[in-house]
Amino acid sequence: RQFENPANPAYHRQTTGPEILGDFAGRRLDFFVSGWGTGGTLTGAGEMIRLARPEVRIVATEPAGAALLSGAEFKPHKIQGWTPDFVPRVLNRSVPHEIVTVTDDESIAASRALASKEGIFCGISSGGNFAAALKVAEKAPEGSVILTVLADTAERYLSTVLFEGIAEGSDQEP
């Protein structure tokens, strides 16, 4: 019932949004990039950022194959936790200034890169957020400060495509 419960975005208005604003008080922030599943983070944190820092561009990101906010039809995708086959009632469509889509492969590759290069063990939706943030960075003015959320751990994905073809160290033969 998170999709319909006004407490969902309210929680992010009271916690995530103020935490971001506090962390960036007196500091530059140009973009906030967030995927959407239940709509809580994008709506709640996004509303607070827009209210307090109207110069910050809010960017929604969604699967390229299920880009409902972009007007596309839903198609199954592999970014678990993102974009059900409907737009949640609590999602405020007026929050994002723009929408960036990412593919399943981009999301998985970004998640794997975060693990191998940065030691951040995150899930596919976090990879999607990071992949979208990289797309924003490609077009943003030099020196822009871009914030995204890495909201899930890769432990939830051990039996999914995220780890497909990755052998355990103990499985490798000499």
List PLM regions with ranges.
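Active-site/ligand-binding loops adjacent to catalytic centers
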Residues: 2-4, 50-124, 139, 161-174
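Short beta-strand segments
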Residues: 1-3, 35-37, 60-62, 147-151
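Short glycine/serine/threonine-rich phosphate/pyrophosphate-binding segments
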Residues: 35-46, 125-133, 157
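Phosphate-binding loop/pocket of nucleotide- and phosphate-handling active sites
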Residues: 131-174
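Active-site/ligand-binding-proximal alpha/beta "capping" segment
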Residues: 1-37, 93, 105-120
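Terminal helix/beta-alpha structural elements that buttress the NAD(P)+-binding lobe
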Residues: 11, 16, 25, 29-31, ...
